[in-house]
From Swiss-Prot:
Pathway this chain belongs to: Porphyrin-containing compound metabolism; protoheme biosynthesis
Gene Ontology terms: cellular component: cytoplasm
Protein name per its UniProtKB record: Coproporphyrin III ferrochelatase 2
GO molecular-function terms, A-Z: ferrochelatase activity; metal ion binding
PROSITE patterns to which the protein is assigned, alphabetical: FERROCHELATASE
Annotated signal peptide: none
Residues noted as binding Fe-coproporphyrin III in the record, renumbered to the chain: 13, 30, 46-47, 54, 125
Organism per entry: Bacillus cereus (strain ZK / E33L)
Iron listed as a keyword: yes
InterPro entries per record: Ferrochelatase, Ferrochelatase_AS, Ferrochelatase_C, Ferrochelatase_N
């Protein structure tokens, strides 16, 4: 019996794969407006500071393909096909949807490599994919909207924090800062759950890791006239030091799932500059990347959606 094909649309932000690609990437983020030479060189300088280019492209591809392999191992009666769709670099989300259509995929599951729902992120990604799929007559896309409280995701970070605390002598003098990418404040007024979801993630991880000293912060805010959600992690570090005299700061950028510019520069460089100024210790646990525990977490999330689809088909077939 021929296996039914299921498209697995894995979506992410995207990143330039070489310094020569930075200008086109930056221009796409700015909706087609080229950045100033000063802004462009500033961004290129950040990439050079982390070794020349971000490892994100390689990690994202590895995450997508390993997740697809896991799904094929879990659901042997189906054939999952991997399609990578990126927001700001090729292959774009639309490229992936068109490829699924050409391949004869009639049904797909989409997952965004970001745990917290926002109109700026997960909603926007899924809307782009579904809008085009409806325009071209398929495939039918079943989106996963959020997974910020997935137990295996919580366990991953709790384990990382526990391991980090083994390196800290005075645990009462240490604090964990859970962070995500800042977004414009206007999303809060519109009822976006992004902030509440980050807080919930932090609370769940803190409980699982049995820590009391923790808070949430925001990082990597855009340079626009609109106010962005705060406090920024660097300002927060200084405030926490002034108030509590913490001697160790543990940064957990749980809004991200891989090492990339925002982690390797904004955390590992900029936040460390602050902790060095304060004569405090800097720690940043390992990111999930394509570790087997995290791939298993993603597979669990996708399998829940797949089981919903299978159950729905059984109901339809029995009626």
């Amino acid at each position: 019996m021929k296996k039914k094909k299921i498209g697995l649309l894995v979506m992410a932000y995207g990143t330039p794969e070489s310094l020569e690609d930075v200008e086109a990437y930056y221009t796409h983020i700015r909706h087609g407006r080229k950045p100033s030479e000063e802004a462009l060189q500033d961004l290129i300088g950040r990439y050079k500071a982390i070794g020349g280019i971000s490892p994100l492209a390689k990690i994202t591809k590895e995450q997508a393909h390993k997740l697809t392999d896991s799904m094929n191992n879990m659901f042997t009666e189906y054939e999952f096909n991997c399609y990578l769709g990126l927001k700001h670099t090729a292959p774009f989300i639309e490229d992936a949807v068109e490829e699924m259509k050409r391949d004869g995929i009639e049904q797909a599951i989409s997952i965004v490599l970001a745990p917290h729902y926002s109109t700026f992120s997960i909603k926007a990604y899924n809307e782009r994919a579904i809008r085009l799929s409806e325009e071209i007559g398929g495939p039918v896309i079943e989106p996963i909207d959020q997974w910020y409280d997935e137990p295996k995701f919580i366990s991953y970070w709790a384990d990382q924090i526990k391991e980090t605390f083994t390196k800290i002598e005075d645990k009462e003098k240490a604090v964990v800062i859970f962070s995500a990418h800042s977004l414009p404040e206007k999303i809060i007024a519109a009822g976006d759950p992004y902030v509440e979801q980050l807080q919930h993630t932090a609370d769940l991880i803190a409980a699982a890791a049995n820590i009391q000293n923790y808070t949430i912060g925001w990082q990597s805010a855009g340079n626009t006239s609109d106010p962005w959600i705060g406090p920024d992690v660097q300002d927060l570090t200084r405030e926490l030091f002034e108030e509590h005299r913490y001697e160790a700061f543990i940064y957990c950028p749980v809004g991200f799932v891989a090492e990339h510019l925002e982690v390797l520069y904004d955390n590992d460089y900029e936040c460390k500059v602050v902790t060095d100024e304060l004569n405090a210790a800097y720690f940043r646990p390992n990111m999930p990347n394509a570790q087997s525990t995290f791939i298993d977490c993603l597979a669990t999330i996708v399998s829940k959606k797949m089981k919903e689809i299978v159950d729905k088909e059984l109901i339809l077939n029995n009626n």
